[in-house]
Amino acid sequence: QHTSKEMLKIMNRRNKVLSDLELFEFLSSNGYALGTDFIVGHPGETEQIWKEAMENLHRFPLTHIHAFTYSKRDGTPSAIMKHQIKGDIAKVRYNELIKIIDDKNYNFRKNNTQKLEVLIESVKNGKYIGFDQFFNSLEIDSPVDLVGDWVFIDDYEVKADKNVARFK
């Protein structure tokens, strides 16, 4: 939920950045696309801690993230901690985090050499939408109804936020 050793301690998390990194590198080297949760703006997240977290984040082979900004909940230990982070600062940090992971995801998709295995889930504006084995979105132009089908794609274009293909 964070990539700063100090922040994990403040958040009372048991995982460790270096052991997490080793695990993620191992899984990534075996062809897995990886994602994680990340809490932005938790009390105590100083500028120094944020800088360390972003430096560490660049080292992680992540392709997806479920990021959210901390929201105070009465009755929790975090709610009474000093150094609450202002919303505008948390928003800037959130956007920085999303940009880093979006870039990592784009590079992952650009460098992928495996055929995509895609489950087509819906059709929108005449295009079929599905997710591949790496949980990346793929938009397919097809004259054939593909909803509910598994398709295998090896010729596709990598766009900023998705892959695009034509099914013949």
PLM feature spans:
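Terminal RNA-binding accessory module
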Residues: 80-168
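Conserved non-cysteine loop/helix-boundary elements of the Radical SAM core domain that shape
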Residues: 1-64, 75-89
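Short, ordered loop/turn segments at secondary-structure junctions
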Residues: 70
